[in-house]
């Protein structure tokens, strides 16, 4: 390898897909379901015990920090039996070597039972639940394979998580259908007492492939936008409306990932989310068969780094190719971004969304740029105030009182 790989500048992080793209739902906008087409020649998309042990041993061994974070993702993670995750705990304990092990798992919530929740509680797992707000919004796109709505089952799952005291948060997709109702969306999460929410804008383009996939790779530039994609205007209005309620009522009580990362960038700290960081490439993904890709949103043949049976995680994640992938986030910014007053706040967002053109016709502008710019312009005075509070070692939540007094 051409560069020194230790000591590492940051912890090595690889998200794991124990069932690949296998899922009991068939959400219209899912970017991952079709990845099963990459593995048509493999009949069973499940991670073997041998591979699981190899991954856990190597993943822990490659860390230089005392805490190690494992992230289990899908597909639908709970389509592996509970015995699989009990084995995960056994192997983590076997190879921990004095380190603290943390686990988080993403699920659609429909398969949760008392038994699953007891396991998560006992082992302190953080559970992320995919839920797109109230029933009308959620069921528009999140249906099962028979075309039936999934909301009721998801809510039953959330009820079980709460009953067992499991720590959980929500991942909500903002699409063309629900983006016009930000407060309905937000009030729903407050009503179900969900204090940590990640709102993710869905942006996909259509490009049929010979193997059955139909979503465009980031390398393809002029493909048709999928109907379910949120528009830049919708995204900007959604964020501004949401922020106006949050900043007046909920700072320090409800945590919205994008608002947290925006404030972090405002004060010059790490945003804690790759989309808003200067560079990316630190979050790889490993498929059920050991294939490792640059990123969860870049699981395309052209972004495959190798396989854990042939190369180590360190070799792949610190390879020159992956370093270039991460650096390209910054290096490929068009002039309009480089000259933008809010570059520090978004850093061009996710490279997968950079298929628009600038006012000068230069390629590489983020499709959602107009929405983000509207948001940053709107929140600037509030972010400035919260930054001042943080730098004075006071609580950002003081902003709510300042607004009441008419200081802002």
Regions found by a protein language model. Give the residues of each.
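Short, acidic, Ser/Thr-enriched surface-loop or helix-capping motifs
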Residues: 287
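Short loop/turn microsegments at loop-to-beta-strand junctions
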Residues: 14, 280-282
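Flexible mid-to-C-terminal extensions adjoining Fe-S/redox cofactors in radical SAM and related proteins
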Residues: 299-408
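Radical SAM enzyme [4Fe-4S]-AdoMet core and its adjacent flexible, acidic
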Residues: 144-152, 159, 163-275, 279, ...
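Conserved alpha-helical substructure of the radical SAM core
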Residues: 1-118, 122-124
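Short Gly/Pro-enriched turn/cap motifs at secondary-structure boundaries
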Residues: 272-276, 283, 327-331
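Conserved AdoMet/S-adenosylmethionine-binding subsite of the radical SAM
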Residues: 57, 61, 79-198, 205-207
């Amino acid at each position: 390898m051409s560069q020194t790989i230790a000591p590492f500048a940051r912890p090595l992080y690889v998200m794991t897909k124990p069932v690949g793209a296998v899922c009991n739902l068939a959400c219209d906008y899912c970017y991952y379901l079709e990845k099963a087409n990459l593995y048509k020649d493999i009949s069973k998309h499940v991670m073997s015990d041998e591979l699981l042990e190899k991954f856990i041993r190597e993943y822990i061994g490659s860390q230089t920090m005392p805490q190690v974070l494992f992230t289990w993702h899908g597909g639908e993670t709970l389509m592996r039996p509970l015995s699989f995750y009990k084995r995960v705990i056994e192997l983590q304990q076997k190879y921990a070597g004095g380190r603290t092990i943390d686990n988080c798992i993403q699920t659609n919530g429909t398969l949760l039972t008392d038994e699953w929740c007891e396991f998560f509680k006992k082992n302190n797992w953080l559970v992320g639940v995919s839920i797109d707000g109230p029933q009308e919004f959620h069921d528009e796109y999140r249906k099962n394979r028979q075309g039936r709505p999934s909301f009721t089952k998801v809510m039953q799952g959330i009820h079980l998580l709460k009953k067992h005291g499991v720590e959980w948060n929500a991942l909500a997709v903002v699409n063309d259908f629900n983006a016009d109702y930000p407060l309905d969306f937000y009030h729903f999460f407050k009503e179900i007492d969900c204090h940590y929410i990640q709102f993710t804008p869905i942006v996909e383009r259509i490009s049929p492939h010979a193997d059955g996939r139909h979503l465009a790779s980031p390398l393809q530039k002029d493909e048709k936008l999928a109907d379910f994609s949120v528009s830049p205007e919708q995204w900007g209005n959604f964020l501004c409306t949401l922020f106006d309620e949050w900043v007046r009522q909920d700072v320090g009580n409800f945590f919205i990932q994008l608002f947290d990362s925006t404030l972090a960038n405002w004060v010059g700290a790490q945003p804690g989310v790759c989309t808003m960081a200067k560079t990316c490439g630190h979050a790889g993904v490993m498929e059920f068969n050991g294939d490792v890709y640059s990123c969860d949103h870049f699981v395309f043949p052209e972004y495959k780094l190798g396989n854990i049976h042939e190369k180590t995680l360190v070799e792949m994640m610190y390879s020159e190719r992956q370093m270039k992938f991460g650096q390209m986030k910054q290096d490929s910014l068009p002039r309009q971004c480089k000259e933008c007053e809010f570059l520090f706040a978004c850093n061009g967002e996710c490279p997968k969304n950079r298929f628009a053109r600038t006012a000068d016709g230069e390629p590489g502008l983020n499709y959602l740029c107009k929405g983000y710019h509207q948001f940053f312009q709107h929140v600037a005075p509030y972010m400035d105030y919260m930054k001042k509070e943080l730098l004075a070692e006071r609580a950002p939540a003081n902003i709510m009182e300042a607004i009441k007094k008419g200081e802002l």
